[in-house]
């Protein structure tokens, strides 16, 4: 059933794992649009959730609810009375016991609670991990929303994060079909961009390790990237668009790790960035092909990876996670010439 949310004002939605990297930006956008937001967190009084209360509209229209992903009754109480649900909460670990069952149960619990509450639409944050991991796919094939990872490959390589994401998404689709819930799923690639939360998450460490000098080399790998602000907006767009359905791949560009390091070196030459690849024997890995046309058709315009990297580093500096070095005399001019928006 297509959802109709022509006027967000007065509408209430639930965001699970509201204090997370992507979720915090979703909450911000929802509050700016006039929604009342019920955000689930493990402990509403934890100082690490203070950034949510400080968001514009937070004091008036944000309710933080204590709910663990494995506590069905608590999730049900949070979702009750909501028009929509954004399920972003999920374990991020390589431990199969902590990753797989909690992720699957969490997805099922949210769908079941949404069905009981007669929620109009559920939007779930899945991952490229549920899409891309297939060694038998033609390297020249274009990765799109119809692609699924190979479960046996994920299991045999002990890639429990991707395995968990895939089985959790499959469980969500099966439960939604069984319960008659309108479900839309987003599959973002590696997410960059400025964090609202005070803590460092795994994808931000991906950038931080190069800047601090802890990574002396970069891997001979390619990865696709997307900005956290675009991912958050995509969640809201697919919730609000009556025509939205199925899965949406969220990726701006696919790049070799060496290219990412080169961009960082041009933007921030003061940091001890690696200059050598860990694997110089084999040919340089080629980025895979993908299409992001489906989400573009809903009006999403992607932030460039270069801009995203710049904003990520500036934010890490401002939050005290990265010591700001003294800028070279021409840094400001060089950044402008590189097509970067300063202070955005």
UniProtKB/Swiss-Prot annotation:
Tissues and organs where the protein is expressed, per its UniProt entry: Expressed in leaves, stems and flowers.
Disruption phenotype: Dwarf phenotype, delayed senescence, collapsed xylem and significant reduction of lignin content in ecotype Columbia. Retarded growth, impaired upright growth, altered leaf morphology, dark green leaves, collapsed xylem and strong decrease in lignin content in ecotype Landsberg erecta.
Reaction(s) this enzyme catalyzes, per UniProt: (E)-cinnamaldehyde + NADP(+) + CoA = (E)-cinnamoyl-CoA + NADPH + H(+)
InterPro entries for this protein: Epimerase_deHydtase, NAD(P)-bd_dom_sf, NAD(P)_dehydrat-like
EC main group: oxidoreductase
UniProt region (Disordered), positions on chain: 317-344
Keyword terms, alphabetized: Disulfide bond, Lignin biosynthesis, NADP, Oxidoreductase, Phosphoprotein
Documented EC number(s): 1.2.1.44
Annotated positions of the Phosphoserine modification: 7
GO molecular function: cinnamoyl-CoA reductase activity
Record protein name field: Cinnamoyl-CoA reductase 1
